[in-house]
Amino acid sequence: MKRLTFLLFCLLLGIGMANAQTTKVTGTVISAEDNEPIIGASIVVKGTTIGTVTDFNGAFSLDVPSSAKTLVISFVGMKSQEVGVKSNLNILLESDNQVLEEVMVVAYGTTKKSSFTGAASTVRGEKIQKMQVSDISKSLEGSIAGVQTTSSSGTPGSSASIRIRGIGSISSSQEPLIVVDGVPYEGSLNSISTQDIESLTVLKDAAANSMYGARGSNGVIIVTTKGSKSGKAKINFEARYGFNARGVKPYDVITDAGEYYEMMYESYRNSLISSMGYAGASQYAAQNLISGNLKYNKFAGVADNALINPLTGKLNPSATSYKWSDDWSKDPFENGSRQEYNINIAGGTENTQAYASLGYLSDEGYVVGSEFERISARVKVDQKIGKYVKVGGNIAYANTIQSTFGDTNSNYSNLFMFSQNIAPIYPIYLYDTDGQLMYDEKGNVRYDFGTEYNRPYASEQNPLAVAKENIRKVLKDNLSSRGYLEANFLNDFKFTLNIAYDVFNTNQTDFSTPIGGDAASVGGRGYKYRPCSWMLWGLRQ
């Protein structure tokens, strides 16, 4: 009886202590503008995940720890508020006018977000600069509703294909119009450093794109670069270093050579049972699995006809060591380094402002043979002339070098597809029957293209060798210049004249090795492509 009384006392004491550790807080949240209750406002204990939301009457009830001192109340479009913990609270939330007063860039200049009636979305430069992308088109991925971006290549510096509000035509181009600092841009977006971006604005509907006519039928992406600033000159330097690695792992396929031999033996045996019977098919399949079917025996010290035990269908226990350790699922892929350095300076007086930047990017892909390098520079100057006139200029230069690893189509020269489909028994390099590497007359390691031992899969193909031996390099020099004149008079009347001159010079080299691959039958092939284009634009608003 005493023990029962003691246990009951401990239980009641524990309940009392538990109740003493929390405090119930109730209250209501209403709008300061119209005194209406706010439905779905968030009430959270500061520094924790303990919280609740208001009901249809704007009321809430929350058990908070006795150590809690502050509650954070927030709602979309309202200013967040912090209040002390009390048993009963009445909270007024005010509208956050800053959201509505945000200025956005549109086709005809700039406007307040609250007064804009078209369909447009903006990604700020601060968000873009947090993304580790070499091409600013990749920054739109998942950032804006109604914008779809796809990329058929994982090569650093490759641009994404952009679709705004779906496909508008089955025969014409689907790409949106790119406008940089008020003027259409025909160059590569990978030539623009993400550190020079002030904002990206996507215009989605016909009203927003009307200024550009038919060219804006697929939507418009307006790129605004960082502008000059008044005040004391400020220098900013940023250095980044990191690594690129394969994010999506290979599919679940057989990677163990012994398991692959056993499954192929079973398949080979089953195909012979109807004509030879089970015992005969088992014996024949084990005797001829290598010589008549797979051609390659990866295991050292085990004869081709003794690799599989026909009685059990299992691998010979003596098959414990490999003649080669090449791994198609790993060897073509390696972590690449990514380093980026940017420096800029901005400042000026009330009438004259300037901005200058210099950047370097080296981005090695995780696939052998893929790399992107960029050197960029930009100078921007704005000058007020009197009270009503303002002029400015913007000159940018970029030198880019992009190396790609090969084919992205669904064929044997696609490194991703090949490495996913080839069996784990086939090597990357060429070995003799004893497992020794073979070399050419110049002392270079030879690659296995499947012709030496009649490989049954993808004869004359080795995409890793092709990626290493082929040359696919694109060198570009882009020079973009922008100038404007802006006149303000008659109160709200503004006249703007934009002029631009762009030069795009490309030097592309493509060489396909004669030692194997698609060009082996013609002794290799190569070409150089050196187009140069220039654009002169003049726009007035």
Language-model segment annotations:
Residues 8-9, 37, 61, 187, ...:
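A ubiquitous, low-specificity "background" feature that marks scattered single residues
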Residues 109, 450-452, 502-503:
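Short glycine-enriched loops at secondary-structure junctions
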Residues 1-378, 383-398, 412, 464, ...:
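Short, small/polar-rich motifs associated with maturation and membrane association
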Residues 235, 453-454, 512-516:
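Short, flexible, mixed-charge acidic loops at enzyme active sites
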Residues 313, 320, 398, 404-478, ...:
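Acidic/polar loop-and-plug regions of large Gram-negative outer-membrane beta-barrel proteins
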Residues 218, 462, 539-541:
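Asparagine-centered polar/low-complexity signal
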Residues 314, 365-376, 382-384, 394-409, ...:
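Small-side-chain secondary-structure face that scaffolds active or pore-lining regions
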